[in-house]
């Protein structure tokens, strides 16, 4: 992969969904399909929305290590980023990624206590394309 920033960014931007993996309270791996990140800063930081009451928030609070996977089904390539998450509940973070129509998920609006932001910070990753894997650091 010649340019990780460009390649990974393109895959992430075109994906309609991504997959968030983490370890649950019983020590087992869990993978959840999520709507694609609302925002990203390069290929280091990604912001996703979720319900504060979800099992994933409890698990990620206890163990912030996680993976974020994006796939390009057209060219059969993908990237798994590894890193840590932080659960953000402050008004500024919530307003930052709020979108029209989010009341479908968060009935009380942007201040809904059951709405929070997952901030994923990548430290490395693995890119797959052409039957080959390539690890990279961020």
Predicted region positions:
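Charged, amphipathic alpha-helical segments
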Residues: 1-6, 50-56, 102-104
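Short Pro/Gly-enriched beta-strand edge/turn motifs at strand-loop
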Residues: 2, 15-19, 99-102
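Localized chelating/binding microdomains
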Residues: 4-7, 19, 28, 81, ...
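A short, Trp-centered hydrophobic/proline-enriched beta-strand micro-motif
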Residues: 10-25, 66-70
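Short, surface-exposed beta-edge/turn micro-motifs
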Residues: 15-17, 44-46, 63-66, 113-115, ...
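N-terminal leader/targeting helix
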Residues: 18-48
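A short mixed-secondary-structure module that forms the rim of ligand-binding clefts
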Residues: 37-75
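Charged, gly/pro-rich active-site loop segments
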Residues: 80-138
């Amino acid at each position: 992969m010649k340019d990780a920033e460009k390649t990974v960014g393109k895959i992430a931007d075109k994906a309609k969904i991504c997959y968030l993996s983490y370890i649950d309270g019983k020590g087992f791996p869990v993978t959840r399909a999520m709507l694609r990140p609302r925002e990203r800063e390069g290929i280091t930081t990604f912001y996703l929305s979720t319900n504060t009451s979800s099992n994933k928030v409890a698990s990620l609070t206890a163990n912030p290590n996680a993976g974020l996977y994006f796939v390009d089904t057209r060219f059969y390539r993908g990237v798994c980023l590894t890193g840590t998450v932080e659960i953000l509940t402050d008004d500024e973070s919530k307003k930052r990624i709020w979108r029209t129509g989010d009341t479908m998920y968060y009935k009380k609006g942007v201040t809904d206590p059951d709405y929070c932001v997952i901030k994923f910070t990548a430290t490395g990753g693995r890119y797959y394309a052409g039957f080959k894997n390539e690890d990279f650091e961020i």
